[in-house]
Swiss-Prot record:
PROSITE patterns named among the record's database cross-references: MTTASE_N, MTTASE_RADICAL, RADICAL_SAM, TRAM
Gene designation per UniProt: rimO
A Gene Ontology BP annotation from the UniProt entry: tRNA modification
Keyword Transferase part of the UniProt annotation: yes
Catalytic activity reported: L-aspartate(89)-[ribosomal protein uS12]-hydrogen + (sulfur carrier)-SH + AH2 + 2 S-adenosyl-L-methionine = 3-methylsulfanyl-L-aspartate(89)-[ribosomal protein uS12]-hydrogen + (sulfur carrier)-H + 5'-deoxyadenosine + L-methionine + A + S-adenosyl-L-homocysteine + 2 H(+)
One Pfam family per UniProt: Radical_SAM
Domain Radical SAM core as annotated: residue spans: 147-392
Keyword terms of this UniProt record: 4Fe-4S, Cytoplasm, Iron, Iron-sulfur, Metal-binding, S-adenosyl-L-methionine, Transferase
EC number: 2.8.4.4
Organism: Burkholderia pseudomallei (strain 668)
Cofactor notes: Binds 2 [4Fe-4S] clusters. One cluster is coordinated with 3 cysteines and an exchangeable S-adenosyl-L-methionine.
Subcellular location, record wording: Cytoplasm
Domain TRAM: 395-463
Protein name: Ribosomal protein uS12 methylthiotransferase RimO
Length: 463
């Protein structure tokens, strides 16, 4: 999420806190939890720097560009406001000297915490901006304070990760996997649906590993036992979504064997149309030698077989993935294997990063580092092939009538998304204005749209 605080406005006497949220959806959920707690304690949220008594900056520290963006945002907040508390992944990052990076670059910050640290952030806020005496807890909705539009929300089911991928430093910043109690997750989901959310995006560092840390302990929801495991959680969320006519979308699904159990829920039975036929699976590469150096599962042939089997069971399945091109030691032949994989798997939506060393990642010690121009050329070539595959798949939708969730309405019509499109990262559907009053649509509504055109990313249609 971009920094949305701007300079202007008048100073306000009430205790107000500004919030800058950077990074991934997991960080966004952390920001929402902080804002919810602030509101619960009677603080108000300011949309400007100079309208705030204090600013909290939630940072990202995954890649060098994100680190710099976070450091710049902290600097801007210090310049515009002066009282800044920093939280998030960058807070856990050390500098070359071994001290905290943020404190070294920006020594004037009031406090620094790591990610998923609502309690520590609130302690820092209390120290520098004492809370009001009479908090109005009833002013905070049961669903909490959200930074997303009212009709969709992220549901974080766990924190941390047990994997040790050589290119990643997330575990060193967010720690080992910690799964939320299943009843707590279900209660949050229910409150979100009750508040009008029509699409719930399930996120974590590793959604498929949900419950591993508690040995799939059995919890209880609505008086019945419910195992703390991805399969059972998705089934329960799908049942809940069906009651509200809503969608559940799965992100960060590591391809464990039990993911196969989810596909039939998407394809048939009462959960069809509610557990969306959509999987965000971070494959990262397809050649076994590269995957081995990445410390990722290395059976690409088996993965391709599974993808093809998933599509047999659920022909409408959309698969999104992310890849790294130019990883240390990647040969021309290994890169071609990667291109063959995305063609054969017919991946619908893909993103690709040119490999970039991340401070603290074990991949930095690998031999065979490739020049910047080679890495970037491979990324560009990868995206050319990926767009060809995507364009071919998306063209098949022309002439079909699809269910679309409207995100925006303007003078030119509407902008929405199908079951195949997650917000912000996938394509959209441009919907023509309704010709009749009976067909007019609003933000947050589902409408049936006949698809009339497509490119490699987006669709066009009419109600």
């Amino acid at each position: 999420m971009e920094n949305s605080l701007k300079s202007s406005g008048k100073p306000l006497a009430a205790p107000k806190v500004g919030m800058v949220s950077l990074g991934c959806p997991k960080a966004l959920v952390d920001s929402e939890q902080i804002i919810t707690q602030l509101r619960a304690e009677g603080y108000e949220i300011s949309g400007t720097y100079d309208g705030a008594d204090l600013v909290v900056v939630n940072t990202c520290g995954f890649i060098d560009e994100a680190v710099q963006e976070s450091l710049d945002a902290i600097g801007e907040a210090l310049a515009e406001n002066g009282k800044v508390i920093v939280t998030g992944c960058l807070g856990a990052k050390k500098s070359a000297s071994g001290s905290g990076l943020i404190a070294e670059v920006h020594p004037k910050v009031l406090a620094v915490t790591g990610p998923h640290a609502v309690g520590e952030v609130m302690q820092a806020v209390h120290s520098h901006l004492p809370k009001p005496h009479d908090p109005f807890v009833d002013l905070v909705p049961a669903a909490g304070i959200k930074l997303t539009p009212r009709h969709y929300a992220y549901l974080k089911i766990s924190e941390g990760c047990n994997h040790r991928c050589s290119f990643c430093i997330i575990p060193s910043m967010r720690g080992e996997l910690v799964s939320r109690p299943v009843a707590e997750v279900m209660l949050e989901a229910e409150n979100l649906f009750k508040s009008g959310v029509k699409e719930l995006l399930v996120i974590s560092q590793d959604t498929s590993a949900y419950g591993v840390d508690v040995k799939y302990r059995t919890g209880f929801w609505n008086g019945r036992p419910l195992k703390t495991r991805m399969t059972e959680l998705v089934g329960a969320l799908g049942e809940l979504a069906a009651q509200y006519g809503a969608w559940v979308r799965l992100h960060y699904v590591y391809p464990y064997p039990h993911v196969d159990e989810i596909i039939p829920m998407m394809a048939q039975g009462p959960l069809k149309g509610h557990v969306l036929p959509y999987l965000d699976v971070p494959f990262q590469h397809a050649h076994p030698e590269v995957l081995k150096r990445m410390k990722r599962p290395a059976n690409a042939e088996r993965v391709l077989e599974r993808v093809q089997k998933w599509r047999e069971i659920c022909p409408d399945l959309t698969i999104r993935s992310t890849f790294i091109a130019g990883f240390p030691g990647e040969t021309d032949a290994q890169f071609e294997t990667l291109l063959d994989f995305i063609r054969d798997a017919e991946l619908d939506r893909v993103g690709c990063f040119a490999y970039s060393p991340v401070e603290g990642a074990s991949a930095n010690a690998l031999d065979g580092a490739l020049p910047d121009d080679v890495r970037e050329a491979r990324r560009a070539r990868f995206m050319e092939v990926a767009e060809e595959v995507s364009a071919a798949r998306i063209a098949r939708k022309i002439g079909k009538t699809l269910k679309v969730l409207i995100d925006e309405v303007n003078a030119e019509g509407g902008i929405g998304r199908t079951a195949a499109d997650a917000p912000e990262i996938d394509g959209v559907v441009y919907v023509e204005p309704a010709a009749k009053a009976s067909k007019r649509y609003k933000v947050g509504e589902f409408v049936s749209v006949k698809i009339t055109g497509a490119d490699s990313h987006d669709l066009w249609g009419e109600v």
